[in-house]
A protein has these predicted regions:
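Glycine-rich phosphate-binding loops of nucleotide-dependent enzymes
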Residues: 1-167
Length: 167
């Protein structure tokens, strides 16, 4: 969850603080190393806002951003931790078509930067267009796994999600 009353920049900085070395004492005493580290964190946070396409909103409160921009802010904050794996749970939920295109481009960019992405998503078009491997669940039970092309031809998947199934 975003901190609604904090700026976009501050939200990303929160994510980066997991990597700090100064500690509480440095923060309380406002030591030189703490100030240098904070400046570096702010710089990296701004870079991440640019990376996800919302750099111009750095000083905007999170609550004022559009729904799609809030999702990108969440992704920037997650990236601030320098994860090996980034899990995205329903990132396209509630997005309009334009926001979904932007999301797809961002996820593709993250993937091309050699980050592993675990995408949990019901938007079949988005999943099939982005993922190298797909695992399909129906009511919590795995019904298919493989490449998007293989999964799309699976009868159980067609019945549950792509065809005339009950979902």
């Amino acid at each position: 969850r975003l901190f609604a009353e904090m700026t976009a920049l501050e939200n990303v900085m929160v994510g980066r603080h997991i990597r700090t070395k100064s500690g509480l004492l440095g923060a309380v005493l406002r030591t030189k190393s703490f100030k240098e580290e904070e400046a570096a964190i702010a710089k990296r946070a701004q870079e991440l806002l640019e990376y996800v396409g919302i750099g111009k909103f750095a000083d905007y409160k999170a609550r004022t951003l559009s729904y799609g921009d809030q999702r990108r802010l969440e992704i920037a904050r997650a990236l601030a931790t320098d994860p090996q794996l980034i899990a995205l749970d329903e990132p396209a939920a509630g997005m309009n078509a334009t926001e979904k295109v932007q999301l797809r481009e961002l996820i593709d960019r993250i993937r091309n930067d050699n980050r592993t992405i675990l995408l949990i998503e019901h938007d079949v078009k988005l999943v099939m267009g982005l993922c190298d491997r797909v695992t399909v669940l129906d009511y919590g039970k795995q019904i298919a796994e493989g490449t998007p092309a293989t999964v799309q031809k699976n009868e159980k998947v067609i019945e549950a999600y792509l065809g005339t199934g009950g979902h």
